[in-house]
C-alpha cells in the first residue's frame, strides 16, 4: 500500500506525540523518543534558541 490519501485514515491508532515528563507539553515524540519543545530524551540541557524568543525593544538614548 502506498502513502497517499487512502492511508491517512489508518493513522489514528497510536498518537505521534504524548505529554512530556519534563515540560508538560504534548510534544514528546513516541517513535523518536524525544520532546520537540524542550529536548527531553535528546539532551540534558533545556532546548532553547534565540530565534524562538520575542525580542525586547531597546530604548534609544537620544
UniProtKB/Swiss-Prot annotation:
Cofactor note: Binds 1 zinc ion per subunit.
Protein name, per record: Large ribosomal subunit protein eL37
HAMAP family listed in its UniProt record: Ribosomal_eL37
Matching PANTHER family: 60S RIBOSOMAL PROTEIN L37 (PTHR10768), RIBOSOMAL PROTEIN L37 (PTHR10768:SF0)
InterPro entries reported for this sequence: Ribosomal_eL37, Ribosomal_eL37/eL43, Ribosomal_eL37_CS, Ribosomal_zn-bd
Physiological role: Binds to the 23S rRNA.
GO molecular function, one term: structural constituent of ribosome
Top-level division of the source organism's lineage: Archaea
Family: Belongs to the eukaryotic ribosomal protein eL37 family.
Subunit structure: Part of the 50S ribosomal subunit.
Organism of this sequence: Pyrococcus furiosus (strain ATCC 43587 / DSM 3638 / JCM 8422 / Vc1)
UniProt keyword Zinc-finger, yes or no: yes
Cofactor(s) this protein requires: Zn(2+)
A Pfam family assignment: Ribosomal_L37e
Residues annotated to bind Zn(2+): 20, 23, 35, 38
Recorded name of the encoding gene: rpl37e
Zinc finger (C4-type): 20-38
Keywords, comma-separated and alphabetical: Metal-binding, Ribonucleoprotein, Ribosomal protein, RNA-binding, rRNA-binding, Zinc, Zinc-finger
Single GO cellular component term: cytosolic large ribosomal subunit
Example GO biological process: translation
Lineage, broadest ranks: Archaea, Methanobacteriati, Methanobacteriota, Thermococci, Thermococcales
Amino acid at each position: 500500500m502506498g502513502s497517499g490519501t487512502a492511508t491517512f485514515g489508518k493513522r489514528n491508532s497510536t498518537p505521534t506525540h504524548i505529554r512530556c515528563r519534563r515540560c508538560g507539553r504534548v510534544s514528546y515524540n513516541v517513535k523518536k523518543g524525544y520532546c520537540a519543545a524542550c529536548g527531553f530524551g535528546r539532551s540534558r540541557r533545556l532546548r532553547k534558541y534565540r530565534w524562538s524568543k520575542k525580542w525586547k525593544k531597546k530604548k534609544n538614548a537620544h
